């Protein structure tokens, strides 16, 4: 490059020196065969050299920008779920549940963030990657006992019957009455925030059903969880275990079962 700059500087002041430098320039770039041709470096040659240099610089710049953008995207993805992961790592399931609700609002879009809650119609706009990231953290840090995909399997096993689902994950409790009655647990004190052998599968995370079950239905039906093994698991008798045990304890028949459908917490 220094040879090229020197040649450009003396182009007008010393023709003979320029001719000599041109030959050296050709030799350095094209080898001894080009030297015997004694072709002077033309303006077109300069243009070609500059163009090649410019193209190389542009390619490097584009590559650098692409790498920067990719790094920024990765960093953003890595940090949006950090708080949730921290709570789960430390087994702070109550805080993790609250953070999950906050994340669900955040990933549902700006309108949901301004509103402070999610419309069930907005769930379909959530990217599968975001829901899977949340779900994977719950599964990883609960030994596979918590998470949306765990809840989905239970929901499908009870043929999408939400009353049976709520009994199965113990979001409902058996009332001490003459007939078998279930009512929603009081939030937050009556829910189970510790992971042990007594904690039912799919108990967390909670999904507010104050405005009905459509939000939960849309979450469990999201394509993010479509690859789950929907056909594996317990038999129908095992799925009815919660109801059957309650019936046996109360000593009444199925025709006397009463479910209270207050799905709020």
Curated annotation (Swiss-Prot):
InterPro entries assigned:
GUN4-like, GUN4-like_sf
What CDD domains would the database entry show?
A: GUN4 (cd16383)
- Please state the protein's primary subcellular location: plastid
User: Which Gene Ontology cellular component terms are annotated?
Assistant: chloroplast; chloroplast membrane
Keyword Plastid carried by entry: yes
The record's subcellular locations are: Plastid, Chloroplast membrane
On assembly, the entry states: Interacts with CHLH, the protoporphyrin IX-binding subunit of Mg-chelatase. Monomer or extremely compact dimer.
Q: What is this protein called?
A: Tetrapyrrole-binding protein, chloroplastic
Q: Which species is the source of this protein? A: Arabidopsis thaliana
Which gene is transcribed and translated to give this protein?
A: GUN4
């Amino acid at each position: 490059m220094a040879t090229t700059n020197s040649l450009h500087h003396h182009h007008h002041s010393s023709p003979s020196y320029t001719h000599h430098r041109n030959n050296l320039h050709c030799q350095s770039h094209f080898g001894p065969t080009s030297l015997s041709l004694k072709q002077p470096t033309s303006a077109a040659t300069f243009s070609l050299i500059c163009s090649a240099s410019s193209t190389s610089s542009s390619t490097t710049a584009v590559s650098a920008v692409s790498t920067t953008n990719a790094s920024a995207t990765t960093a953003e993805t890595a940090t949006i779920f950090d708080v949730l992961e921290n709570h789960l790592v430390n087994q702070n399931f109550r805080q993790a549940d609250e953070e999950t609700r906050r994340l669900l609002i955040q990933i549902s879009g700006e309108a949901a963030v301004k509103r402070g809650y999610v419309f069930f119609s907005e769930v379909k706009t959530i990217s599968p990657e975001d829901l899977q990231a949340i779900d994977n953290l719950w599964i990883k840090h609960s030994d596979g006992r918590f998470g949306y995909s765990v809840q989905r399997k239970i929901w499908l096993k009870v043929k999408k019957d939400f009353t049976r689902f709520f009994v199965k994950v113990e979001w409902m409790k058996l009332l001490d009455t003459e007939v078998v009655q279930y009512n929603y647990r009081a939030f937050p004190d009556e829910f189970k925030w510790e992971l042990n052998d007594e904690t039912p599968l799919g108990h967390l995370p909670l999904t507010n059903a104050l405005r009905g079950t459509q939000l939960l239905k849309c979450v469990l039906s999201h394509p993010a969880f479509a690859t789950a093994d929907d056909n594996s698991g317990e038999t129908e008798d095992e799925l009815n275990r919660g109801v059957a045990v309650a019936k046996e304890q109360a000593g009444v028949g199925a025709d006397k079962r009463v479910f209270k459908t207050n799905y709020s917490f």
